[in-house]
Amino acid sequence: MQFKQDFFTQLPEFYSQVYPQGLSHPQWLAWSHDAAQLIGLTQPTDELLLGLSGNAAIDGATYYAQVYSGHQFGGYTPRLGDGRSIILGEAIGPNGAWDVALKGGGPTPYSRHGDGRAVMRSAVREFLVSEALYHLHVPTTRALAVIGSDMPVWRESQETAAITVRLARSHIRFGHFEFFCHSERGRADKLLQLLNFTITQHYPHLSCDPSGYKAWFLQVVQDTAKMIAHWQAVGFAHGVMNTDNMSILGDSFDFGPFAFLDTFQEDFICNHSDPEGRYAFGQQPGVGLWNLQRLAQALTPVIPSDDLIAILNQYQEALVQTYLLLMRAKLGLTTLDKSTAEQDKQDLELIGQFTVLMEKNQLDYAQTWRQFGQLDPRSQHSSLRDDFIDTHQFDTWYKAYQLRLGDVTDIAAWQTERNSVNPKYILRNYLAQEAIIAVEEGNLAPLQRLQQVLSRPFAEQVEHDELAKRPPDWGQGLIMSCSS
């Protein structure tokens, strides 16, 4: 790997230098060839294993943990930082640079009495979801590899330590800006320095002046809205949408007790530590705006409040338009050249009525959408109908859907298009759990198979049909803990 060190050299007050503590008897558990290509790597080598497990220095790496703060479950925590993630620098790839971070690399000055380690199950889950979201076309950070070990760590019980090697276009979070506004009061110079660095590095088309700052914040608002619209369309619940887990670039970031929906449930909670459902699936769009409001509050020393409010008011439109684009594609509705407010309203009602029917009839979210690839929309009798207990309500919806759909002349092409946007395979929690259990038993084959299948989620892959089935009773709607 070839590194540059722009963050390290230009923002010395934004991190602490710290070196990883090596895993004992490291071994490759997973490797993403797609992600490796981003930074010019090809194969997982023994030399690379030693370096990424913290047992040998990597040429050009600097090793540091970033400092930031954030709102966690609505309350402000003045000092957080990378408690177990150590960044090596920005690896230069054929199409840009990517931060390389060792998540689980050992304690840092921000570990808050923690051991700085990640357990194997959380490392595998983060790897799988990073790559699964990417192949579902959801904006996300990436995962290069998982490295296992025989090092014991204690959570609820004894487990083994592992490292997820994360790739990110940037690790700058909403919480970085909050830290230098709230926790380091009087450091508006550092806030401005961070803002100028972010624009120069990631928005080079913008200027570092008042007009550029406003244009940048608008881009952040729009990118965040688009990311969350993708989550809602694909049925993804993040679980811990604290502001320190929000990427400034609008990439899905810092995965913990996440879940993809099995049965559609608007108020689904995937996080055992969120009994009130602050971060429930249906709450995510509102939380996204709340988090952006906290970011805006931190930016008041450099951007006038009236401008920030005006930009925040554009969040809903960006969210709705992206959501409509994605959901119209799932339904096969014509994307209008000039969408009117009335048409948008009608389409949102049509989509909302269908998801309400899915919830009332306890239908599987992914499987139901996938059936549109077998649907003949010209037929008066939908093949979907048998899945609904209340067939009368479905018939009413289906008539409205057919009216909005209009004439479909090439049925085969229409069905192929539906299969290209409605995945057959998603990362169901029970599938991840089965792969983790197999890894604990020394068998990597189920993990490798699951990774391979999730890299082609829209393909039929009939030999893997069982991975597309609804979960067994024990695996339905699993709620995960934040323990990692």
Curated annotation (Swiss-Prot):
GO terms for molecular function: AMPylase activity; ATP binding; magnesium ion binding. Its EC number is 2.7.7.-, 2.7.7.108. Mg(2+) binds at residues 245, 254. The keyword Transferase applies. Its cofactor is Mg(2+); Mn(2+). The keyword Iron does not apply. ATP binds at residues 81, 83-84, 103, 115-116, 166, 173, 254. Belongs to the SELO family. NCBIfam families: PRK00029.1. Nucleotidyltransferase involved in the post-translational modification of proteins. It can catalyze the addition of adenosine monophosphate (AMP) or uridine monophosphate (UMP) to a protein, resulting in modifications known as AMPylation and UMPylation. HAMAP family: YdiU_SelO. This is Protein nucleotidyltransferase YdiU.
